[in-house]
Amino acid sequence: LMGLETPTAGRVQGAGRVSAVFQEDRLCPQLTAVQNVLLVLPDDRQEAAIRQDFARLGLDEAALALPARKLSGGQKRRTALLRALWAPGDTLLLDEPFTGMDPAAVQASIALLRERVEGRPVLLATHDRAAIDALGWPMLELQKLAQPGAACNSTNKGLQ
């Protein structure tokens, strides 16, 4: 995983389901943002709560009525993040989830992320130092644990 370990024998096996935000949003372009999130759920009983989450992230009802292909890059990223947060999964993988978002959307996304991942393993790959500091999670830098339990304050730009 990310070059942290080089297996020499055995096998790698995941436990449970994994939710992810990739650098490409991988949304269904013909569906609305809400419909894209509902795809990961067994039914639509959570639609009102999903709409509230979108409101917290700054997407209004007009944006939610558009097909995903007409959303801005930042709106697509917020949709992908919400879909991963709502997806049933034991582990969350986030690859540059805040790319293309304005600062207010990043802060709102970080606040929601912190609330929703309590006790859930998260692997976040980002170059966004402000986001790392705001999250305050343990961090790996240059393949070493930089500071357990809190974000690192070093100025080294070689994050992996």
Task: Please give the residue ranges for each predicted region.
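Conserved signature/switch motifs of ABC ATPase nucleotide-binding domains
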Residues: A87-P88, E118
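Conserved ABC ATPase "signature" region
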Residues: E47-A63
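Hydrophobic anchor residue at the start of the ABC signature
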Residues: L81
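Walker B catalytic motif
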Residues: P67, E96-P97
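ABC-family nucleotide-binding domains
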Residues: D95, D102
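Conserved ABC ATPase signature
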Residues: P67-L71, Q75
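Helix-to-loop junction immediately C-terminal to a conserved catalytic motif
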Residues: M2
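Q-loop/switch helix immediately C-terminal to the Walker
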Residues: E24, Q30-R45, A49
